[in-house]
Amino acid sequence: MNAYPTASTPRLWVFNPGHEEALSFSREKRYTLSKEIRWMRHELSPLLRLLASGEDLIYAPASPEGIPARLLNAEGDDLPAGCDLPAELSVVLWGLDDHIVRELRECPLFLSTTLLFPPITPSYLRLSHRRASYDLLAYLTDQLGYPSDLLPRWIEAGVDKSDTELRLRAAIEGIKSRPLGDPTRVLIKRPYSSSGRGVFPLPLPLQEKHLEALVGSCTRSGSVSIEPYLEVIDNWALEYTRSESGEISFFALSHFDTLPSGRAYLGNILTSPEDLWERLTSLISEEALLALINAQCTWLEEELSDSQYTGYIGIDLFFYRDGEHLRLHPCVEINLRTTMGVLAHFAYEQYVPDGRKGVFRLERGPRQQPSQSIIPLLLTSSEAHFSAYIELEK
């Protein structure tokens, strides 16, 4: 079931990955997206047909090379030139941020259409900050007994460079002293970032050039997270929906791959919900999984009690190696937005034949050629910067 049920007002679906970093810039400032993110927005927007239906439209932003923004129908096809638009469109953003709202308000495609935007509330901004992941992890540590050594150290920028440097040195030493994690490095995360962006390892022992760069990053962003560098073995996510009444409901499991660096999304395992559940409960007990889901739902409902946010929420997990044991990190990050795991869920429902399994792939470069095992999800040229496809098990 879609978290955005079909309504009387047609919807405008907008794919705006990278919105987390945009949140760190005030609405008065012009935020410049990286070229890579602009190509992602331009080329991957048709994937939102997995969510759209009926009279819905999809907004495909302009490319970095000047290809203008365009509108697609719910099947992902270009609207004919001069096509009349609905008088109103209810905007459904991949992730909320003021900069995409301004882009849409100023877009000439919508001169004769009223766009209805979701509100961006203080509680939404609070939970979009990586500090929220710390707060949820602390709650799970207290309620369910997960190890406190997983908790990051959040360091706010000091009054000057020297003060910031002292704070960072102390935090790094504190993380190093823990029995958990790789002793040759720690992990640094910027406050508004996700899906591998704004995350980088810091080698130890600490070198002055690396410390100087870290001080600069902390000063620019206002804070950074420092946490143990763990050997990630398996990546999962718990996907939730939040209704207009504020109820948080479990939606689906997501089992995904990352690039060899371990910090960037590569693709999702496509199989039945029952099979995903069986796979995950082979690694932790069903009782522990249900307790985790219930605890996360409780925390999310409380933290979003004054929010008007409706839609998807993804909480990333991973299994890491601790000596001879495989252990669960129950909250790596919170994604208060639609996720690739949600798209993969609907790709499985809509494209994978009964009884088959596969992988949802998102890759740089042109698409794989269609075959009995490859199902392209985008119509792209040989010059495409990104491709998305399903690879069925043979």
Q: Which role does the model predict for each range below?
A:
Residues 39, 250-275, 337-339, 346-356:
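Extended active-site and interfacial segments that coordinate phosphate-rich ligands
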Residues 221, 250-253, 262-327, 363-366, ...:
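A long amphipathic alpha-helix within ATP-dependent nucleotide-binding catalytic cores
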Residues 325-328, 336-394:
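C-terminal active-site "lid" helix and adjoining low-complexity regulatory extension at the edge
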Residues 37-47, 51, 59-176, 193:
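Conserved N-proximal alpha/beta basic substrate-recognition cap immediately N-terminal to
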Residues 184, 210-265, 318-331:
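Phosphate-binding site of ATP-dependent enzymes
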Residues 154, 185-211, 237, 261-277:
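Glycine-rich phosphate-binding loop of ATP-grasp-fold ATP-dependent ligases
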Residues 2-51:
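N-terminal-proximal low-complexity accessory segments that begin disordered
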